[in-house]
Amino acid sequence: MELRSQEVRTLAPENDPLKMGMGWKVDDLSKPQILVESTFGDSHPGSAHLDQFVREAVQAVNENGGKAARYFATDMCDGIAQGHDGINYSLPHRDAIVNLVEAQANASVYDGGVFIASCDKSVPAMLMSIGRLKDMSAIVVTGGVMEAHTLPKEYVVNDPACAINELLTLEQIGKFDAWEKTGVIPNSQLDYYKHNACPSCGACSFMGTASTMQIMAEALGLMLPGTALMPATAPELKQAAYDAGKQLMELVKKGITAKDIVTKKSFENAIMVHAAISGSTNATMHLPAVAHEFGIEIDADTFDRMHRGAHYLLNIRPSGDWPAQYFYYAGGVPRVMEEIKSMLHLDVMTVTGKTLGENLEELKKNGFYEHCDAILAEKTAGFARPVSREDIIHSFDNAKGTDGSIAILKGNLAPEGCVIKHTACPKNMFEATLRAKPYDSEEECISAVLHGEVKPGDAIFIRYEGPRGSGMPEMFYTGEAICADPKLASSVALITDGRFSGASRGPVIGHVSPEAAVGGPIALVEPDDLIQIDVHNRKLAIVGVKGEPKTPEEMDAILAERRANWKPKAPKYTKGLLKLYSQHAVSPMKGAYME
């Protein structure tokens, strides 16, 4: 076992005394040095509790022949940053965390790492960091998912979009806020929902980006089986953190590094799982960015290809009925993988030191599924009818859908592509021709929606919100305002070069590429252009002007004339992180990472 940490001790005589100044003992200096990196901090519920898992991992490393060192790269919260310019930092700060972790790991030189995170950008950041440090042994621990709040009868509302109205989760707050603004519910009722939507720490309890990326970490083989998206309050999660630290030491001793585990096949497995869970559209950026760090090239088109014909199984919000905490009760990632086993590469290596196929067989033998069934029965004992795991994770033969959940659309409006989560889109909008109503900021657009200026049959555009424009913030509130209006929810499309929250529902199309800031066709859209959406044929195109259809050749000529008159906007940012990101970010179709 060759240790890089021991090589540098001979190069810098100050190395040993500086570590002993932190309380290290002489015999600690010759042990494998292990980085325990987390996003712990008081920034949001997904990170505020991570210190307990750090302690467990540190203890496990120290008790199993290593010496652990804690490092922190606290992340921001998309939810807390919503509604103001803070949301522009969301995607750029993913890359900022990666750069910080790279510096921390390489400046001191570690032999392995335990990486602990929970949420939208922090989990992808840790996965990207592992890719950048791929010659090191690595394992991931995620902070689990928060509880849902059980509503008293007087606060239960009959929402036809959800069959389980008694359980409150955070992604519903945007809709309730829109209802309060339009007089559907009183302010006191909104306050109750706001004060009870996050009853514990953990990632938000729906299949948004945080939950999706926790699952992706396990699907890539970087987590212990069955430990992704556990309830944050479950005692098993602390045990999982300890077990991860212990297993990391086994990987170090055997010389198994991250690059031995994560391969092209691993990413293909993750994308198949993504299809089965109807995962967040943001994964179409994050997984290519992670793959890039590993020297593996995948892009959004890979998702489209692999989602076609894939079985979609998960009945979890926002594309289903149940809060995300029930995912673990129904068997978690192993149950999903067991159902789609015929579609997976079972020979890939994982952090257990065994293959995925061996892990799945072992779980069946050690009572994992019986344990989950018992917890599900306990957690749903007071419900009106018995709840089975098939209510939450459907079987392969009884899938909710058989065409995955993500589609990449292309056409003269998005030559490089754009993304739609079709499992959250009304079927009548799969083929539609709408009138364009473009806005150059979300603030203008949401005001128009709330003041009744948007009508059925409109295609709303929010542009100059891509990576090079403003850092690619979420367009969450506009989407929720549309979904909260019954007249608009299935008759209006929202199209943007920005992105959406993993909680977004409805006919929302994001990541339009090339983006407006670099002169993409979305910058050329004018009011009353005719916009064709065709999900089945993967098409998004401008097919007419001023309400009149045009031939493809006529549209090419019209767009060429508009392009000749288009002038780029001045850079929005002139200093700091947002300037760096907007200058160096690649297309969302490739991962929106900085190059």
Show the residue positions of the predicted features:
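Catalytic or ion-coupling anion/metal-binding cores of large enzyme and transporter domains
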Residues: 1-46, 53-73, 79, 85-90, ...
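Well-ordered mid-protein domain cores that form the structural environment of catalytic cofactors
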Residues: 90-94, 98
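A short, small-residue-rich loop immediately preceding and capping a beta-strand
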Residues: 105-126, 138-142
